[in-house]
Amino acid sequence: MKRPGSNKRPAKSKDGAESRPKRANRGRQQLRTITRTARRDVDAPVEETPESSESEAEEAAPEEKKFEQGKAYDALLTLLQSEHPEKSDKKKTASRHEEDDVAGVNLEEDDDDDDEEEEEEENDEVEDDANEHGDPFEVHFGVDDEAVAAKAALLSARWPVAHKAKVGAYAVTTHASPGEKTAACEAPRAQTLGAPVKKRVADAFAARHPAPFSPLEQELAHHIFSYRDVLYASRTYDNTVHRKLYAAHVLNHVFKTRDRVLKNNDVLKNYHSAQQQGKATGPEPEPRDQGFTRPKVLILLPTRNAAYEVVEQLIGMSGAAQQENRRRFKAQFHADGGPPDSKPADFRAMFHGNSNDFFSIGLKFTRKSVKLYASFYGADILVASPIGLAMILEDPKQAKREYDFLSSIEVLVVDRANELEMQNWDHVHTVLRYINKIPKDFHGADFSRIRMWAINDHARLLRQTLVFCDFLTPSVSNVITHSQNIAGKTRFRPETTAQTCVMNSVGLRLKQIFQRFDAPDPQSSVDARFRFFVNSVLPSLSKQTSYDDGLLIYVPSYFDYVRLKAHMKTHTKLDFSAIDEYSSRAKITRARHFFSTGKTKLLLYTERLHHYRRFELAGVKNIVLYGPPENPLFYKELLRFVGKSVFKGDADTDLSFIKTIYCKWDAAALERICGAEKAAVLCNSVNEMFEFR
């Protein structure tokens, strides 16, 4: 699946100066294609988008005109169109090339000037504000090499539960790595950041966030600063407590790494000086304090605006007086405006500012400055979108592929994971596949300083993975399930009750039907759902509905949508339209108009299209959900479609319904819709059909 765009690129001119050479299968358009990962019985037919007349293109409703406000947001809408005429204007072509570039990419080796600058700063006094033996950083990364090797042999075993707790509305579960317990040091639970966090970070954090931590923030900070893997679902888009915590954590990690290297440099320098004077005693120190390459932190984010906010937070907490390339960074990553106020609040927050998803930038910190657009091999922190990194990691030209800069990542942050799912989760898998691989080249690394567990290809066992999302999904949860951090992993699972679920907040007494089908495992549920729908649900729809028109079929998965549409075209005589994220604006406008006026009786509608456009569909009288939406807000918005028809007098609450097809493997999504108590009944009861109002 991809957000469609033109496959054409300007041809290279004779002198090669005016445009780029054409690259086969490269660019945002190719990389946004979601490859099929599971077998399908029905192949997806290739559809040709019908050409639309000018009058059809001008049929857009007033809502569409408001929708186009804001330059950055309009750029997002442009990506969703399938018809992109090629521009002949050279200036515009050059501009488009700049936009197609992965903003911030710099794969050159680190500059000599930067090395000289750091050598000057090495003379500065290194902060010594933490007890090494009581510091989670020192204990975690200073673990014995033999202990790491022993853990590596046991990672396929079961990870036992080490601790369970209930903090507010969250169930917190910590799993320990299998085998003998290694040396560990946990960060304290406190109302603010303190030791062992570096003083400069703690002071800057306190200045920006003076309020004491809530119990949830204390628990979250405890696990993050103890170097455990963390999976945290924030429940709502505006709950951003985790962002300030991981920003402080990655800065603390970078500064401690730098200070450790500088301290050991002094130790070696003093030894060699004593050796020259004939005063050296004992063997030469052999500190192991480095990886193959410099980058230690990778932060994955969905949009440039999200990256802008995180980088600004990092700069603010770093206390850097000098900020190199700050103006260029703001020009490429920041933008004003966004979606209109008529859109939901979470949607406006998601696509506010620059919503371009194509970027990758390096940040290099010294004691007095921060350099934006640093070389990837000289940066401390990499901030990127998965699609931006995939462009580099899997360049079609084998010789241009680069992944060495990910070899020594020690902290991985995946933020706004649900948005990344909607873009293309395959790119997250691509990044995870390349991270902590032994590099092809060694880029001037000092092997005498590289940690043995890195040389032994065990870096993944020490890497901390932090995943943050609005709601838990199987894809997001699997990142932590398959992580191998020997410090353990902690999950923060929000508990949804009947009082806090979406169903309880609708305010519309509408018939809500849930119908279960059987599936022995998640893999077989795809085919089982399709068979159940086409054999049991689809044939009975005309008998169950009280209206001849206004039936909306909502399909969460694009592959299921293509399969279902192909079946309905070839095996039924249903009068229906189908719109998805590939459809042109004219086609969407036409389909919506025909559906709202009753000329089309049935409309197929994908979850990803709703995510990116959040339409207010008119004429909806009944809804069938091919599967429960992962985002519970979508369920509420779908109900509102029917409520709109009821308000206009086109439908009646006693006759209209919303039916959800589900199996026991949809339990997490059901819990967010109807609460944990009802979800347990829906999945485990003998009955297969339930009705609520």
Curated annotation (Swiss-Prot):
It comes from the Eukaryota. One of its GO terms (cellular component) is nucleolus. Residues 44-61, 107-130 have a biased composition (Acidic residues). This is U3 small nucleolar RNA-associated protein 25. The gene is UTP25. One of its GO terms (molecular function) is U3 snoRNA binding. It is found in: Nucleus, Nucleolus. Residues 12-21, 62-71, 83-99 have a biased composition (Basic and acidic residues). Residues 27-36 have a biased composition (Polar residues). InterPro entries: P-loop_NTPase, UTP25, UTP25_C, UTP25_NTPase-like. One of its GO terms (biological process) is maturation of SSU-rRNA from tricistronic rRNA transcript (SSU-rRNA, 5.8S rRNA, LSU-rRNA). The keyword rRNA processing applies. Belongs to the UTP25 family. Its main location: nucleus. Residues 1-138, 273-292 are annotated as: Disordered. Coiled coil: none annotated. DEAD-box RNA helicase-like protein required for pre-18S rRNA processing, specifically at sites A0, A1, and A2. Keywords: Nucleus, Ribonucleoprotein, Ribosome biogenesis, rRNA processing. The keyword Cell membrane does not apply. Residues 1-11 have a biased composition (Basic residues). Component of the ribosomal small subunit (SSU) processome composed of at least 40 protein subunits and snoRNA U3.
